[in-house]
Amino acid sequence: MQVLVRDNNVDQALRALKKKMQREGIFREMKMRGHYEKPSEKRAREKAEAVRRARKLARKRAQREGLIGGRTGAR
């Protein structure tokens, strides 16, 4: 992975690198590989993530169609 350093601005280059790594999912991968995950645990986690994604997609779809209101912050 490469990042251009312009005008000796290392801070800006570091921010760009972090953003690229975040987009690629490297931080998440490092966190996951920090300890061994049993195959059964991996399957359970992936299934839970898929359910979460499906619910989020259904919620967004319903909101877009006007079935439910958006998040307003008021309770």
UniProtKB/Swiss-Prot annotation:
Gene3D superfamilies: Ribosomal protein S8. Disulfide bonds: none annotated. Keywords: Ribonucleoprotein, Ribosomal protein. One of its GO terms (cellular component) is ribonucleoprotein complex. One of its GO terms (biological process) is translation. The keyword Glycoprotein does not apply. GO terms for molecular function: structural constituent of ribosome. It comes from the Bacteria. It holds the Pfam family Ribosomal_S21. InterPro entries: Ribosomal_bS21, Ribosomal_bS21_CS, Ribosomal_bS21_sf. Belongs to the bacterial ribosomal protein bS21 family. This is Small ribosomal subunit protein bS21. It comes from Brucella canis (strain ATCC 23365 / NCTC 10854 / RM-666).
